[in-house]
Regions:
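N-terminal first-folded block
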Residues: 1-28
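Long, charge-rich, low-complexity alpha-helical segments
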Residues: 29-100
């Protein structure tokens, strides 16, 4: 089910990111835009880095964040890479196929 939020361009779709707020017509979560902005990337630059988004969509995401900060912070925390994994090299171990 797609649920339109009170912000233009922002929707929730239970089939995309478990219903996390996203930009309508994309799979881009509001949190992705917010994380760039919190790193100091200005909105104009965000729309250049994410060229599939318009300035209106970027500002809609930031407006949604302004009204729902606790919710977006929760999504950011859920998707944070644990410090123990940051900078580590994950190694692929080849396994022979099991033949029955």
């Amino acid at each position: 089910m797609v649920q339109v939020i009170e912000q233009q361009y922002i929707v929730r779709n239970d089939k995309i990111l478990s219903g996390e707020p996203i930009i309508q017509g994309t799979r881009t979560p509001v949190r992705a835009i917010v994380e760039l902005w919190r790193l100091g990337v200005p909105p104009e630059e965000i729309s250049i880095r994410l060229p599939h988004l318009t300035m209106a969509q970027v500002f809609a995401a930031l407006s949604y964040y302004s009204d729902h900060q606790a919710e977006i912070h929760e999504y950011i925390e859920r998707n944070r890479i644990p410090e123990a994994l940051v900078g580590t090299k994950l190694e692929y171990k080849h396994r022979e196929p099991v033949v029955h």
